[in-house]
UniProtKB/Swiss-Prot annotation:
Name assigned to this protein: Large ribosomal subunit protein bL19
GO molecular function: structural constituent of ribosome
Organism this protein belongs to: Dictyoglomus turgidum (strain DSM 6724 / Z-1310)
Cystine crosslinks: none
UniProt keyword annotation of Ribosomal protein present: yes
């Protein structure tokens, strides 16, 4: 039964998603439908969490707008997500970066990861 579900899900999974890790700064191009109009909204921020797996995989992206932290959860394999670009690789030692919610300024900065680092 599990194999049947995996094969079904594989059909709907996107293949062009880059490797994303918590701490990375990403730019998500998200399709928004407003009435009969459709537009692409670009949302750039730091990935603070990556959850689930397979077709249900989601990332939580956080950015600060006018001093207020804004978080948005994006399903990676949703047809509404046009594309995801990795702007910068971050070096962190945690899988969930929820502690960034309490931090601001320099203490909320994430060091850049070297390409040869794992």
């Amino acid at each position: 039964m599990d194999l049947i579900i995996q094969n079904l899900e594989k059909e709907y999974m996107k293949k062009d998603i880059p490797e994303i890790w918590p701490g990375d700064t990403v730019r998500v191009h998200y399709r928004i439908v407003e009435g009969d109009k459709e537009r692409i909204q670009v949302y750039e921020g730091v990935v603070i969490a990556k959850k689930h797996g397979g077709i249900r995989e989601t990332i939580t992206v956080r950015k600060v707008v006018q001093g207020v932290g804004v978080e948005r959860i994006f399903p990676l394999h949703s047809p509404l997500v046009e594309k995801i670009e990795v702007v910068r690789r971050g070096r962190v030692r945690r899988a969930k970066l929820y502690y960034l919610r309490e931090r601001k300024g320099k203490s909320a900065k994430i060091a850049e990861r070297e390409e040869n680092e794992g």
